[in-house]
Amino acid sequence: MEALAPTAQRLLAAAQRLLTSGGFEALKLSAIARAAGESKASIGYHFGNKAGLVTALVDSFAHDANRGLIEDTGELPKGEERIHALIDGETRIAADAESYQSFFEVLPHALRDGDLRERVAALYDGYRETVLRCLDASDPAAKEQLRPFAMLMIAVVDGLAIQHVLDPDVADVAAATDLWERLVRPYLTEAGSLDQG
């Protein structure tokens, strides 16, 4: 996330290292600041509070991949190529076991902590918007029609990621998303996303 100040980037990198090595319980503000070589007050300055830092951390797991999805699909005409690029990109996200392992460390806490839950829910809204942008759903009617697909796309990615993290030798993410692409074509055709217009 290049838009962050260098101090904020160091804090996020330190938080990621601590999360990877010690789980969510290792995300103590003093430990993060110490690992980043920064003051504890810098966390408040850059992120507001721990929930803000954890939200930025969760966003960092998929930020570059989502940006890449928007760029890759935006270069393609509306239609099959664009749909394939979207699902191919989502396949790569689902197969990123390291990022999802970190996300799964945070998720139970987001479900219990109201502030964190609200922030992670806002991230999910952004992920759905990413799918809608990739489908070129720019007007309100198209967004309304394609929002259920966006919700299911995110659910498929999360569900496949869980299976891939638990059993990477058996969970064939690519085969599952190939099937998903075939299953959604009739719906996307009806919605106008596969028209070459």
Give, region by region, the residue ranges found by the protein language model.
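Hydrophobic alpha-helical connector segments
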Residues: 56, 70-100, 149-153
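Amphipathic alpha-helical packing segments from all-alpha helical-bundle domains
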Residues: 66, 70-71, 96-104, 114-139, ...
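Short, basic, alpha-helical segments at the C-terminal edge of helix-turn-helix-like DNA-binding modules
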Residues: 59-66
